[in-house]
Amino acid sequence: MATPVVTKTAWKLQEIVAHASNVSSLVLGKASGRLLATGGDDCRVNLWSINKPNCIMSLTGHTSPVESVRLNTPEELIVAGSQSGSIRVWDLEAAKILRTLMGHKANICSLDFHPYGEFVASGSQDTNIKLWDIRRKGCVFRYRGHSQAVRCLRFSPDGKWLASAADDHTVKLWDLTAGKMMSEFPGHTGPVNVVEFHPNEYLLASGSSDRTIRFWDLEKFQVVSCIEGEPGPVRSVLFNPDGCCLYSGCQDSLRVYGWEPERCFDVVLVNWGKVADLAICNDQLIGVAFSQSNVSSYVVDLTRVTRTGTVARDPVQDHRPLAQPLPNPSAPLRRIYERPSTTCSKPQRVKQNSESERRSPSSEDDRDERESRAEIQNAEDYNEIFQPKNSISRTPPRRSEPFPAPPEDDAATAKEAAKPSPAMDVQFPVPNLEVLPRPPVVASTPAPKAEPAIIPATRNEPIGLKASDFLPAVKIPQQAELVDEDAMSQIRKGHDTMCVVLTSRHKNLDTVRAVWTMGDIKTSVDSAVAINDLSVVVDLLNIVNQKASLWKLDLCTTVLPQIEKLLQSKYESYVQTGCTSLKLILQRFLPLITDMLAAPPSVGVDISREERLHKCRLCYKQLKSISGLVKSKSGLSGRHGSTFRELHLLMASLD
């Protein structure tokens, strides 16, 4: 009897050279999982079929690098934002530019299409969020509230809300109809890179550079659970179509999570590096990553991945819509999104033949739109993907065939054949998570939850590092032994970059030391600030903090803005240095500042007093700005929490 061929659970599909220069952004079409759009430093947007090596279409018109791209749900429109702040919308079926939208003052960091209406949301480095009406070619509303770049935008499935994630460590929820913020979700300690709505329930997931994923209840506006211990910054998450689990694209692995309670269902090794986007089609998860000018695509067979804590359900068929949301046994039922009633499966297309129905564009916009082109590189692939939509109804949508899985390597096949289950069973240390058994094993009692790891106040162990990460890993059957060259390549990875960083820091410190030896402390601090490297500022402040007599009032005016940055840093040593410096300033200079501001004006001209009064006003303004940050962090637990509470008491006189 022939031995059945064992196929891989995850494999690399293809690698392409997507642009003539570096790739800066990419996105997968979520409806088909087969359409890929890439934006590059060559100012172009290129479209690809995920399983073909040739570019389908190249969209031109931007005059600066493309920073963000997004496809709408039916994959008929694409929007791209550039480094200059301009936004362009193309019609893929008509193969032409549809709109040029101007208004942001900095590069576009995030985009999203409204699921039903013809609206686009954009987030920028200028901290603003704008909602655009594609039909009228204008900004409908501007949402303000973030203090740093907006990295991700997502509309809710019912189209009533907009979630935003930013570098200021917060997630905000906006009501589109009321035009105001509904709630702010603090809790992350690093920039938030991605947010994703649950497909059915009032639940939101957010991933951050602090290596955590948080789940938020959108009825009670509070955190449901927090998954910690991700191997790196969280950049890409995706809910399963039936909402039973969340996929997280980690560094070289795919992790499957539940949230009530927080636990890890499965971990699959995928050598995709830093995955940029995920999509699901035909029970296969497609992941794409980019490096320099190359884009790589990977496939994970979800039929061999554990997605719930109970017996696996029948796979969701992509060629037919869900009749109703499948209940998640691991979570209580929440309120379900109410989709608006529609007469067709896609929004009404923009009419191009009636110029009077929309605002007349300026002559500059006309010129920009005339210069924008859609160059069809492969007519056969273009007609196959886009042209049939004009004459063939897309209800039900066209079904694509799953990608065939390649067989395992010979050595791996022999080992896999000896296993009772074809699924790859790899155990990873996942802190604070409960790893459930795979089906068909049914556990009568839940597995005990791991005790949370406590980071000691004294740094007798590396913060953020776990000894289990350095233990010998379980041998992976499908991976061959590393040859010497590959092993050395892995060891050297990042070495050149670190050398550049350390060399630059050494040069900057030499510059500051040269000024310091002249005895001018204020000029030394000014030069450190001008370098625009917080590590140099921290090194200098650690020296100044040791001798309180070095502090002067004019030094405070320079240091206080840097202290505000340090208090918001994700590095513990930076925060600690900022707190120490702020405490010294408050103890030595706050009484002087308050007395100077409260004193009546003097008679006659006193130049030195006027200069001192001006410095006191600057310090008071900066301290007021910092006081809000200190108050928000005074509720933290641990050593930093007590330090911030002490600072909050010292700053009470500012109120």
UniProtKB/Swiss-Prot annotation:
Region feature Disordered, mapped onto this chain:
311-422
Q: Give the modified residues of type Phosphothreonine.
A: 395
Q: Could you give a GO molecular-function term held by this entry?
A: ATPase regulator activity
Q: Give the region (Interaction with KATNA1 and NDEL1) as residue ranges.
A: 433-655
Which one GO biological process term can you cite for this protein?
microtubule depolymerization
Question: What SMART domains does the database record attribute to this sequence?
Answer: WD40
- In its UniProt entry, what is this protein called? Katanin p80 WD40 repeat-containing subunit B1
UniProt organism field: Homo sapiens (Human)
